[in-house]
């Protein structure tokens, strides 16, 4: 039986830090679902469809990654996808408290759902989609932090 994992997030937009995490997850699991949350409560720069397309392009080189959008409760989505592992990236101690709360709630809702936390490579440990967008809005160079297709899409949005 295949070991299926879900790496959920808003990915607005997907960064090289996210790519680092999903790439490493593909070495641990047979199938990784990059699950892009609709996040209606967040004001996203990119639509769900745009985020899915950008992530599909950025992960096309990874053979065992499937990119899907979702708007369901994470535990329900995981159950429907026959996944028993959630992948989460932890950049700093500040991420841990929130992620721990999510992990406990998800486990309450779906007891067989395990959360696996991966630390990004040092090179990406300080970046976030929000920070990259903010720097780009002020004409800072963010080429190093984004896949090329995502960089081009971000520049087009900001033009």
From Swiss-Prot:
Coiled coil: none
SUPFAM superfamilies hit by this protein: Nucleotidylyl transferase
GO molecular function: ATP binding; pantetheine-phosphate adenylyltransferase activity
Keywords assigned by UniProt, alphabetized: ATP-binding, Coenzyme A biosynthesis, Cytoplasm, Magnesium, Nucleotide-binding, Nucleotidyltransferase, Transferase
InterPro entries: Cyt_trans-like, PPAT, Rossmann-like_a/b/a_fold
GO biological process: coenzyme A biosynthetic process
A GO cellular component annotation in the UniProt record: cytoplasm
EC number, as in UniProt: 2.7.7.3
Stretch forming the signal peptide: none
Paired cysteines (S-S): none
Residues holding ATP: 10-11, 18, 89-91, 99, 124-130
Pathway, per record: Cofactor biosynthesis; coenzyme A biosynthesis; CoA from (R)-pantothenate: step 4/5
Primary location: cytoplasm
Site description Transition state stabilizer, residues in chain: 18
Keyword presence, Cytoplasm: yes
Reaction(s) catalysed (UniProt annotation): (R)-4'-phosphopantetheine + ATP + H(+) = 3'-dephospho-CoA + diphosphate
Claim: Nucleotide-binding is one of the keywords in the record: yes
Localisation per UniProt entry: Cytoplasm
Residues holding substrate: 10, 42, 74, 88
Function summary: Reversibly transfers an adenylyl group from ATP to 4'-phosphopantetheine, yielding dephospho-CoA (dPCoA) and pyrophosphate.
PANTHER family (UniProt xref): PHOSPHOPANTETHEINE ADENYLYLTRANSFERASE
Subunit composition and interactions: Homohexamer.
Family from the record: Belongs to the bacterial CoaD family.
Protein name as catalogued: Phosphopantetheine adenylyltransferase
Organism annotation: Shigella dysenteriae serotype 1 (strain Sd197)
Highest classification ranks of the organism: Bacteria, Pseudomonadati, Pseudomonadota, Gammaproteobacteria, Enterobacterales
């Amino acid at each position: 039986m295949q070991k299926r994992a879900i790496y959920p997030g808003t990915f607005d937009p997907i960064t090289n830090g996210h790519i680092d995490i999903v790439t490493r997850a593909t070495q641990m699991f047979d199938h990784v679902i990059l699950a892009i949350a609709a996040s209606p409560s967040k004001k996203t720069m990119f639509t769900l469809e745009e985020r899915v397309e950008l992530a599909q392009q950025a992960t096309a080189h990874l053979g065992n990654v499937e990119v899907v959008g979702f708007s369901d409760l994470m535990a329900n989505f995981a159950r429907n996808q026959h996944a028993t592992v959630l992948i989460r990236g932890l950049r700093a101690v500040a991420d841990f408290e929130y992620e721990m709360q999510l992990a406990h709630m998800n486990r309450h809702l779906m007891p067989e759902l395990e959360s696996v936390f991966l630390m990004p490579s040092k090179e990406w440990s300080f970046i976030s989609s929000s920070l990259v967008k903010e720097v780009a809005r002020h004409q800072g160079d963010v080429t190093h932090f984004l896949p090329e297709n995502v960089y081009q899409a971000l520049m087009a949005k900001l033009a």
